[in-house]
């Protein structure tokens, strides 16, 4: 199954065990997000719990759980797969308060990628139910910053770092930036298919966020996955694209920005690649005729 899948199962089993022994409490934070099917930035090794009503934390410490104080209203609680948990917006807000910006952003973008109806306006409207706690303003700003195109936590990290570098002036020469853009290519057997790229800068510089999962065997035969990615990259390069791949270490450091700056400086300007399709990823997924074509 692979280490990644095993760790995910361990996460869910930990959450299940804690919930079984704490029947009056409600999951919140990253544990609730994972139970609701969202990606998290870090592995869940301790379960955040809250009590319905207006509760305070107490002194006893537990290795597998932590109790959070504050107001938890009935409308912020749901039951999912037999376990009581905070609704997603509250779980993500608590993740923001207790674990920081990056953890919350990964969860937000995971939710938005999986559920197209979760637009920025919809999520901001949902924050009206949240307690007037410290961090609410920053959380609302984070929602406005979030996107709906990140299919993985690594894509969220890369997207966020690039956008912040552009905004701060650390990364220059970016005239256009787009996410999840499709190109017509041929697969290894010669059949037409669509290659979706994670980030497209200036129309022709492609950034692919490659986590260990693609080549670990968790998504199928590892050697086959590597060969498939190499063929895909060659097809894109044949259209005039410049492809740069980044992993977790680069995406979380300035190495990503340095890599992109070198590439942009060496290849300035905007170009249009000939095999780009006009449909967005969301349009493609929801339109069977486009996929069939």
Protein language model annotation of sequence segments:
Residues 113, 118-293:
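Surface segments flanking catalytic/ligand-binding clefts of nucleic-acid enzymes
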């Amino acid at each position: 199954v692979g280490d990644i899948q095993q760790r995910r199962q361990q996460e869910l089993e930990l959450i299940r065990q804690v919930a079984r022994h704490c029947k009056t409490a409600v999951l919140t934070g990253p544990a609730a997000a994972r139970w609701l099917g969202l990606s998290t930035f870090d592995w869940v090794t301790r379960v955040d719990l809250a009590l319905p009503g207006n509760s305070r934390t107490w002194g006893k410490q537990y290795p597998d759980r932590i109790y959070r104080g504050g107001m938890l209203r009935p409308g912020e609680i749901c039951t999912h797969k037999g376990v009581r948990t905070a609704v997603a917006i509250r779980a993500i807000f608590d993740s923001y308060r207790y674990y920081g910006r990056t953890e919350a952003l990964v969860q937000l973008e995971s939710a938005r990628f999986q559920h197209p109806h979760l637009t920025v306006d919809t999520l901001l409207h949902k924050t009206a139910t949240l307690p007037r706690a410290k961090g609410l303003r920053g959380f609302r700003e984070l929602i406005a910053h979030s996107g709906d195109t990140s299919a993985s936590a690594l894509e969220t990290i890369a997207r966020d770092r690039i956008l912040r570098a552009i905004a701060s002036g650390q990364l220059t020469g970016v005239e256009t930036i787009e996410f999840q853009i499709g190109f017509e290519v041929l697969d290894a057997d010669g059949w037409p298919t669509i290659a979706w790229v994670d980030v497209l800068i200036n129309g022709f510089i492609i950034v692919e966020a490659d986590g260990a999962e693609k080549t670990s065997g968790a998504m199928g035969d590892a050697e086959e996955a590597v060969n498939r990615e190499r063929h895909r990259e060659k097809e894109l390069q044949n259209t005039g694209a410049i492809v740069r791949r980044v992993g977790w270490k680069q995406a979380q450091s300035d190495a990503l920005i340095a890599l992109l700056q070198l590439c942009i400086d060496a290849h300035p300007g905007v170009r249009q690649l000939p095999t780009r399709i006009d449909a967005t990823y969301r349009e493609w997924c929801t339109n069977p005729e486009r996929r069939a074509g």
